[in-house]
Amino acid sequence: MAKIPKKPEEIFEEMTGEYQSIFGAHLISIVLYGSGAGEDYIPGKSDINFLITLTDQGIDRLDRALESVARWRKRNVAIPLFMTRTALEGSQDAFPIELLNMKRHYVVVSGKDVLAELAFDRCHIRLQLERELRGKLLHLRSGYLSTEGNVRKIRALIAASLTAFISLFCALLYLKNIEIPNGKREIITAAGKAFGIDAAIFLKCEEIRRGIDRFSKNEVTAVFQAYMKEISRLCNQIDRIEV
């Protein structure tokens, strides 16, 4: 059985050597990002996420990494995000929220720090926020209907959706020039204070996501309905945010 690392750094040397062997001089950098680079990493539960930057010639040789990617997935390493330097820099206006969150917690494992000089236009972030919030609200509603009221499925829907909303909260705080806290609960609390939403609802959702709540079936349903209501309130606010 593949060994799941207790800490991501346990695999840095092995992984770096493997991808250097595969791509050689076409490997520009390997960067760890996400929970593995912060305080939220849980061995066996959290994926380990890497951004691997390649030259144009290297990106055309991804077939060489097929076996390596499959092997690392057995050790909870997510499929790496492979990009060229040009594509990464060109994504600052298309995917600013993803890159903003990536830049919050990362570790350069090998090569150049390709994230250091990335900067984000607040107009681009606001536009993506509006699109993401409204789109995710629609998915929440349709997802709720698909549960047919099954509390286990409602719990799963909360757990699957909350992390994405916390990432959006980070972008919302960035728009208001508010320092983004490190922990999920702290981010939720800060967003609630900054935007007048009920942080307590999202904190209950976080308890459900972590599996530490003691809510009844009716309470879980009530939490979810309040969850959708607060997201709807955020959608109404985003149009009024000046950048």
Regions found by a protein language model. Name each.
Residues 12, 119, 123-243:
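Conserved nucleotidyltransferase catalytic core and NTase-mimicking acidic/glycine-rich helix/loop elements
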Residues 28-36:
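Short gly/ser-rich loop at a beta-strand->alpha-helix junction or flexible surface loop bordering the NTP-binding
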Residues 62, 66-156:
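Conserved NTP/Mg2+-binding pocket subregion across the NTase superfamily
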Residues 17-21, 71, 108, 193, ...:
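A generic structural signal for well-ordered alpha-helical segments enriched in polar/charged residues
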Residues 1-2, 115:
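Short glycine/proline- and acidic residue-enriched helix-loop micro-motifs
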Residues 23, 27:
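Active-site palm subdomain of RNA-directed nucleic acid polymerases
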Residues 2-22, 38-45, 51-95:
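Metal-dependent nucleotidyltransferase catalytic core
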